[in-house]
Amino acid sequence: APKPEQPAPAPKPEQPAPAPKPEQPAPAPKPEQPAPAPKPEQPAKPEKPAEEPTQPEKPATPKTGWKQENGMWYFYNTDGSMAIGWLQNNGSWYYLNANGAMATGWVKDGDTWYYLEASGAMKASQWFKVSDKWYYVNSNGAMATGWLQYNGSWYYLNANGDMATGWLQYNGSWYYLNANGDMATGWAKVNGSWYYLNANGAMATGWAKVNGSWYYLNANGSMATGWVKDGDTWYYLEASGAMKASQWFKVSDKWYYVNGLGALAVNTTVDGYKVNANGEWV
């Protein structure tokens, strides 16, 4: 009998696909390390007190003496207060304005002017020059005005204190101050003319006798030369200004005679010579 066919082998079940492996979970994030707590700063070491550490700090010493603040100088008294007004320090005088700042240059206190140097020290008993003008301050520092006698000479300081030069009219008289400011006396030549200043400095006009000779000064003070009429009388002044007297002399080819007083002889006879109304020998 036929052999029964071998049944086909039962199919092997497929191997089931391997179960998917679960993915590895992402590692849990590590907690951030907390920032390290800041270390407390080391406290600054206390400076060693000058004295024993147990003593409290001494209060600040008050300012005394000169202090420069914002470019200005101030002076503080020993009690710490700021000085104002006049201050004597190390032999010099200083002036502190109302705000305490040290003054320099001209300062008016009351009716008087004073001058403080760049250092602040007051000038005294001296001549000094400011902006090409000369000034004088006395021993108290006060600016001089009017007449000033200095080292035997006289000077005149105008109302604003500057030294006068040239002609000065004062109380009705004229005076001449030389270029260096000293008052002229005696003969002075100014702009080509001669003038005579009396011993007190006043300019002479009219007749003046100097060293035994007579001179005539015009109304403007200038010395006359040549013919001069004073009143009704004529006189003759030489080129030097000296008046001729008791002599015959010749001018422009004419002869004239003047007597002992210098007066020109007219309409008369002198030494047998006749002179006419003009004084000319005829």
List the predicted regions and their residue ranges:
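Extracellular adhesion/carbohydrate-binding repeat motifs centered on closely spaced tryptophans
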Residues: 1-282
